[in-house]
């Protein structure tokens, strides 16, 4: 087996060298025109994405062979490695079939505006850091920016898988059980699919958040910097700072404040303060939208739908929306306190148990209090859902959890009021379940049983 693998890897290396050499020779002799003679764009395909997906799939094949040849895969990590490549190869093939990508064009417009010393367009709803950084690749054009951001998202996809497994392990899941959950979760996942399909910044922000959670107290500077970056990319992760604050790690808080300010100064140094005022203007514009977008499953969009039917003016709707979000915030804080008190997710003996028990409910606040909640924002509720798996025991609770999970992650995106607002209801159901399980005295038998079963599962890697 080892000899066959070595031969396969040598063949892969030779073929890779031949492909690379052919591209170089064709380009040097005939330029881009010459490449066009050998490469065709199929209808309903994006050539940039097609070539990237093909190249990365080929590199994955080489990486698998390299790991096997060098005995890097063993009985301890085979689940983890296999899960990684299953997820990556699945999405490389799925995303290759998509020929139109969305939100990166908003980023391109914003970056172009900054480069031309113009105000940020009203379609850009983030702090100015992202647009400030992207302006340096604007000269590459539309397809050049798509190529870079598409690659970044594939890297973030792999990082998301790795960090999700590590976070679940942090909460007591065995490695194999965590891998199975991560692979199943990522394989059928509407918010994840749409985040990648729109080349969205959400996946980057979620990776930064999970990395910040894992590095807390191990390296306070890195942890604080990662969360500060997430806030500058998406703003809403600021809600998670409360969980870190409850740990009373003043060193971490000082680093967070300092790094947040230093990052904020990057756009100021390059563009002045105007982009921040543009951001505030764009957020204010959101509060004056009068119609409902059924893709936007926020409280704002939901209540605006009733305005023409009930004769409610926009100001009254804004007050109702603010009231609903305030109630959600209070409910989440109450549930968070109960989770900390009852050690819902981790025991008192676990390091950083306050942070780990507090943060799941805050992901729901972070998601639903935003003025716009698109389908892909559901990726931010990942841990709120998955960490409940070992807390629920009764059939009734499983039915409620399954219903919420179906609405949030499995149901395709569609526009049909009020049924398409299931992604507004699903996190609220999970918040209620977080509260309900604090009343239960049952031990997490599912987690214990699943961990034991997967750890006792034995197999051998042939050499």
Task: Label each residue range with its predicted role.
Residues 227-244, 370-377:
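Transmembrane helices and adjacent periplasmic/lumenal helix-loop junctions
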Residues 4-222, 247-376, 382, 386, ...:
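Primarily membrane-embedded glycan-assembly and transfer machineries that use lipid-linked glycans
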Residues 243, 269, 417-419:
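Interfacial aromatic-anchored transmembrane helix boundaries in multi-pass membrane proteins
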Residues 231, 322, 373-374, 420, ...:
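Short alpha-helical segments used as structural interaction elements across diverse proteins
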Residues 22, 26-53, 387-457, 463:
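Aromatic-enriched
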């Amino acid at each position: 087996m080892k000899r066959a693998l070595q031969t396969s890897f040598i063949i892969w290396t030779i073929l890779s060298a031949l492909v690379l050499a052919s591209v170089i020779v064709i380009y040097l002799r005939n330029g881009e025109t010459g490449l066009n003679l050998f490469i065709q764009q199929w209808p309903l395909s994006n050539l940039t994405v097609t070539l990237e997906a093909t190249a990365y799939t080929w590199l994955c094949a080489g990486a698998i062979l390299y790991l096997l040849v060098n005995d890097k895969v063993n009985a301890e990590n085979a689940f983890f490695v296999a899960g990684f490549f299953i997820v990556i190869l699945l999405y490389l093939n799925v995303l290759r079939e998509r020929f139109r990508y969305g939100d990166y064009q908003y980023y391109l417009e914003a970056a172009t505006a900054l480069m031309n010393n113009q105000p940020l367009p009203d379609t850009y709803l983030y702090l100015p850091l992202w647009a400030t950084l992207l302006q340096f690749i604007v000269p590459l054009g539309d397809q050049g920016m798509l190529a870079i951001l598409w690659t970044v998202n594939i890297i973030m996809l792999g990082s998301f898988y790795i960090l999700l497994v590590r976070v679940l392990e942090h909460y007591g899941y065995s490695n194999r059980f965590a891998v199975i959950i991560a692979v199943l979760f990522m394989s059928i996942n509407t918010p994840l699919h749409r985040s990648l399909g729109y080349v969205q910044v959400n996946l980057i922000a979620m990776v930064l958040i999970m990395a910040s959670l894992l590095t807390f107290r191990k390296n306070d500077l890195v942890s604080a910097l990662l969360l500060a970056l997430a806030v500058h990319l998406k703003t809403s992760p600021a809600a998670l700072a409360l969980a870190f604050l409850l740990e009373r790690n003043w060193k971490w808080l000082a680093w967070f404040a300092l790094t947040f300010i230093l990052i904020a100064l990057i756009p100021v140094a390059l563009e002045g303060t105007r982009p921040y005022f543009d951001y505030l203007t764009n957020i204010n514009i959101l509060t004056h939208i009068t119609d409902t977008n059924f893709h936007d499953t926020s409280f704002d969009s939901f209540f605006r739908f009733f305005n023409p039917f009930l004769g409610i003016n926009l100001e009254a709707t804004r007050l109702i929306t603010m009231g609903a979000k305030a109630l959600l915030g209070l409910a989440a804080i109450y549930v968070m306190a109960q989770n900390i008190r009852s050690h819902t997710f981790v025991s008192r003996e676990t390091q950083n148990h306050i942070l780990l028990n507090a943060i799941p409910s805050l992901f729901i606040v972070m998601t639903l209090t935003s003025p716009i909640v698109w389908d892909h924002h559901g990726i931010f509720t990942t841990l709120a859902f998955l960490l409940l798996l070992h807390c629920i025991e009764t059939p009734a609770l499983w039915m409620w959890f399954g219903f919420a999970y179906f609405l949030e992650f499995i149901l395709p995106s569609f526009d049909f009021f009020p049924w398409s607002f299931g992604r507004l209801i699903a996190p609220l159901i999970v918040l209620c379940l977080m509260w309900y399980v604090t009343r239960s005295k049952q031990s997490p038998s599912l987690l214990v049983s699943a961990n034991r079963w997967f750890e006792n599962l034995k197999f051998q890697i042939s050499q």
